[in-house]
Amino acid sequence: MAELKVSAIKEGTVIDHIPAGKGLKVIEILKLGKLTNGGAVLLAMNVPSKKLGRKDIVKVEGRFLSEEEVNKIALVAPNATVNIIRDYKVVEKFKVEVPDVIEGILRCGNPNCITNHEYVTTKFYVISREPLKVRCHYCERTMEEEEILANL
């Protein structure tokens, strides 16, 4: 297998095991195009992977993720791994998990839902993880992966 040649980061976050083609969506939902700390963002797409066949990897220099951001990643890449890097070493590594209840991260796809008209925090219950399916607490609309990704 070919060696992956990407420079190491001193401080920051590496998001690994993103399904091939979804790395750009991870960058979009984390708003990494608007970084103001001067840190580099690296996207490796369609990289060979024993586990997935092909995968994407996102490296973010000088930035660590909040719990809400990790939950957003779980909706796009439920099997992703997050690596926290300090002084060029992995100091923490964990798999993302889709929470049972998703609050304030996702918009409801139902234009008539109260959350689209009032200042109400959205709330969804996970019905299924594989394939991903959620139900709105307020209007009970069920959304599947494609609609979930469109409403992040």
UniProtKB/Swiss-Prot annotation:
Tell me how the cofactor is bound. Binds 1 zinc ion per subunit.
An example of a Gene Ontology BP annotation on this entry? 'de novo' pyrimidine nucleobase biosynthetic process
Q: List the cofactors.
A: Zn(2+)
Residue positions binding Zn(2+): 108, 113, 136, 139
Which keywords annotate this record? Metal-binding, Pyrimidine biosynthesis, Zinc
**Which GO CC annotations does the UniProt entry carry?**
aspartate carbamoyltransferase complex
| MF GO annotations | metal ion binding
The organism's place on the tree of life at top rank: Archaea
Q: Which Pfam families match?
A: PyrI, PyrI_C
Matches recorded under HAMAP family: Asp_carb_tr_reg (MF_00002)
- Assembly and interactions? Contains catalytic and regulatory chains.
This chain's function reads: Involved in allosteric regulation of aspartate carbamoyltransferase.
Q: Which family would the database say this protein is a member of? A: Belongs to the PyrI family.
Q: Would you tell me the protein name for this molecule? A: Aspartate carbamoyltransferase regulatory chain
- Organism the protein comes from: Pyrococcus abyssi (strain GE5 / Orsay)
